[in-house]
């Protein structure tokens, strides 16, 4: 297994993503906006073409996405997997929110896979939350957040290793990558995680910045393009900026293949 990258573009630039990408992640709040019909159509077509499309909330973007919004977006996109609601500050609240989200989505006809996002202040609480999500919600995937080193005090790869040992049949998805992109050159993570989402390579590219292993510049953040949510509304006709974004994507797709091949 080689990790698949889900690149997150602004709504206006989805059609320029490389056609060979096998996995995608889209945001429910952007899907249901009537002014983003092209964004919704793009991800619906990816689902119809057999690509693995993950539907996520806009929690990272600072929005409070309801299960009703997730359900409405799921009816449009027909994703392979939906990320259940969570609360990064509370394992108990995460379980309650995920159960409610899963219940509402099933009642509204969603029959696909769920991704649960475990949380905890200690490793034991974290793994118990993962076990509870598996039992209560029937999740097929665990989403491992980028902030693991800050919340648990261990490397992200260690959290993945623990989940792998306890739940070998459950897929792992990395929610975001760190600003130094170290996850994308870690042979263990590339072999053990199914997929990973990030907007970083595109954000750098739209700033006309090329990024390669050993040459990772400071990350400007989505704020450079308007903000976390405003990023999806970003529009540019600068072909040099998009060429740089595509170059970053292609560079790191080659890196993933090379590192994974060397580890196998």
Show the residue positions of the predicted features.
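Non-catalytic, usually N-terminal nucleic-acid engagement modules in DNA/RNA processing proteins
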Residues: 1-106, 243, 252-264
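Phenylalanine-focused residue identity feature
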Residues: 42-43, 52, 60, 114, ...
């Amino acid at each position: 297994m080689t990790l698949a990258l889900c690149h997150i573009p602004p709504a206006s630039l989805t059609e320029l993503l490389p056609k060979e990408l096998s996995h995608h992640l889209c945001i429910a709040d952007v899907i249901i906006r009537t002014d983003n019909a092209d964004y919704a159509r793009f991800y619906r077509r990816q689902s119809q073409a057999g690509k693995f499309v993950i539907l996520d909330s806009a929690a990272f973007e600072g929005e409070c996405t309801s299960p009703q919004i997730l359900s409405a977006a799921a009816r449009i996109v027909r994703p392979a997997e939906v990320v259940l609601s969570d609360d990064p500050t509370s394992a108990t609240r995460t379980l309650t929110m995920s159960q409610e989200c899963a219940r509402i989505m099933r009642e509204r006809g969603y029959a696909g896979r769920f991704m649960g996002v475990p949380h905890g202040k200690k490793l034991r609480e974290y793994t118990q939350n993962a076990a509870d999500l598996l039992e209560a919600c029937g999740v097929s995937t665990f989403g491992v957040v980028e902030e693991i080193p800050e919340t648990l005090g261990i490397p992200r790869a260690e959290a993945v290793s623990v989940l792998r040992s306890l739940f070998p049949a459950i897929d792992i998805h990395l929610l975001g990558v760190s600003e130094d992109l170290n996850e994308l050159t870690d042979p263990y993570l590339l072999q053990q995680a199914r997929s990973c989402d990030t907007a970083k390579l595109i954000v750098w590219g739209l700033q006309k910045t090329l990024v390669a292993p050993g040459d990772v510049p400071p990350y400007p953040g989505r704020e450079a393009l308007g903000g976390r949510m405003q990023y999806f509304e970003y529009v540019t006709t600068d072909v040099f900026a998009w060429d740089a974004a595509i170059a970053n994507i292609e560079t790191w797709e080659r890196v993933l293949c090379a590192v994974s091949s060397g580890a196998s």
